Amino acid sequence: MPTALCPRVLAPKESEEPRKMRSPPGENPSPQGELPSPESSRRLFRRFRYQEAAGPREALQRLWDLCGGWLRPERHTKEQILELLVLEQFLAILPREIQSWVRAQEPESGEQAVAAVEALEREPGRPWQWLKHCEDPVVIDDGDSPLDQEQEQLPVEPHSDLAKNQDAQPITLAQCLGLPSRPPSQLSGDPVLQDAFLLQEENVRDTQQVTTLQLPPSRVSPFKDMILCFSEEDWSLLDPAQTGFYGEFIIGEDYGVSMPPNDLAAQPDLSQGEENEPRVPELQDLQGKEVPQVSYLDSPSLQPFQVEERRKREELQVPEFQACPQTVVPQNTYPAGGNPRSLENSLDEEVTIEIVLSSSGDEDSQHGPYCTEELGSPTEKQRSLPASHRSSTEAGGEVQTSKKSYVCPNCGKIFRWRVNFIRHLRSRREQEKPHECSVCGELFSDSEDLDGHLESHEAQKPYRCGACGKSFRLNSHLLSHRRIHLQPDRLQPVEKREQAASEDADKGPKEPLENGKAKLSFQCCECGKAFQRHDHLARHRSHFHLKDKARPFQCRYCVKSFTQNYDLLRHERLHMKRRSKQALNSY
């Protein structure tokens, strides 16, 4: 018969059958030959007891099997195994309310679990609070295991008894953390429980100076709705967030109502039994209303160090905004030498954007000649405006201007911002076009636009007419211009034209040309040769009279060259037609 390691734990007898592993609740037992799920293996691994094995070797082997069925090292990598371990520990440290809900979501990684918790915290109407306790031994549990025997033996007082007993002892730190009240003799083997018991004893000594927060019977809860009474040593173990959480108030699960301090006037009426105890209001009473504030600094039940800590927190709060002192503007501040009429005289001058930009580099210290300060009275405001604008303001009522205003000298409009004033000046300048082009007479509103326009007139014009000497930027413009010179009436002098007209009147109508030849109305001005069509004349001039002009386009089939690529392509098409005919004839 195997022997047990611990004298208090006995190995099962040979006649007795070993205890069967119970399946987790809500899951059917796996059929024989089928591997259990990883979640089932994890729960069996965590719930395994030494008494379920016949000996230490069998217990170790059983733990190896259950751990392998949970972590699956043959499938998962090291990173995935670590992810499963961290996920299990994260779920174990969650509060009971959040833990059960997150486990039901079956997260596969820590990021999914964190996302589920964050989504639950953001859910409206359910302000889950993160209950941060003092350090206690980590017990990994899935949330379905039964309570310990000591916890099951703790009596649960009904709500009615707790509501009636107003002089009950305050809740201690050990009771808040769920630790049972044991005598020191039973805590010799557990050092953590010894520390908790010592904290409980110190807390009992301070109960004479501390009172508890009593709630109505319908809202009584053993942990959530009570102010925790910690000793000075307990308070030193908590961080500032936990100190504020436990010391001021605890937000419950079903109501998100907090009672900030420093508002004694908004406290509700208290009955005779609750004169010195603040009451937490119901959620339905505070919907749509401003939350009242309750101050705990004047309560005699608080420890001195608690009062000091709360005062420090209140000092760190954002103070109310105080009204800035208004600067008094002297009424006799006028631009341009202190004369109130100098403004009207300066408005008659021409205002440019450059003057406005240079006049107000720093708007607080320097003001341009057209930036006026706010005057003392409405009459003084109207006194600084032009007559046209003054009459309109008198008819419409009081002039509402800011401390700093810009007045347009042309129309009298007032602008508060300098940017709008400059934009207004630019719009007026665009409407007026004082700059005229000396070549074509076009009008421009800006001198820079005129300079750019003049550059277009001075651009290079390589195409020059041989008859009159005019230059053109495009060859098409030159060809259209040559049509004027190709007309015979315009080529002849005025006297010859008059003489020819008189001769035609004397002789009568001309006879048609011999051999049925058409009339040649296009004559070359250089050689006198006449052509029937103007394109024939243009070809004649390009071949015979423009030989000195550069011909960069050379034909690859012959020695001819052309001035334009279009003529070269048309010439090469003739070569291609001839070659195609020769190729067809060769077959």
Curated annotation (Swiss-Prot):
Start and end residues of each SCAN box domain: 42-124
Domain notes: The C2H2-type zinc finger 1, also named C2HR, mediates the interaction with NSD1.
GO terms under biological process: positive regulation of DNA-templated transcription; regulation of transcription by RNA polymerase II
SMART domains assigned to the protein according to its UniProt record, in alphabetical order: SCAN, ZnF_C2H2
Coiled coil: none
Alphabetical UniProt keywords: Activator, DNA-binding, Isopeptide bond, Metal-binding, Nucleus, Phosphoprotein, Repeat, Repressor, Transcription, Transcription regulation, Ubl conjugation, Zinc, Zinc-finger
Gene Ontology molecular function, alphabetical: DNA binding; DNA-binding transcription factor activity, RNA polymerase II-specific; RNA polymerase II cis-regulatory region sequence-specific DNA binding; zinc ion binding
Self-association and partners: Interacts (via zinc-fingers) with JARID2. Interacts with NSD1.
ZnF start-end (C2H2-type): 406-428, 435-457, 463-485, 522-545, 553-575
CDD domains for the chain: KRAB_A-box, SCAN
Protein name, entry field: Zinc finger protein 496
PROSITE patterns referenced in this protein's UniProt entry, alphabetically: KRAB, SCAN_BOX, ZINC_FINGER_C2H2_1, ZINC_FINGER_C2H2_2
Purpose of the protein: DNA-binding transcription factor that can both act as an activator and a repressor.
Phosphoserine modified-residue sites: S185, S299
Domain KRAB: 221-291
SUPFAM superfamilies: beta-beta-alpha zinc fingers, KRAB domain (Kruppel-associated box), Retrovirus capsid dimerization domain-like
Keyword Transcription regulation (UniProt): yes
Family label: Belongs to the krueppel C2H2-type zinc-finger protein family.
Protein location: Nucleus
GO cellular component, one term: nucleus
One Pfam family from the record: KRAB
Region spans: Disordered: 1-40, 260-282, 358-399, 488-513
Polar residues bias locations: 389-399
Organism whose genome encodes this protein: Homo sapiens (Human)
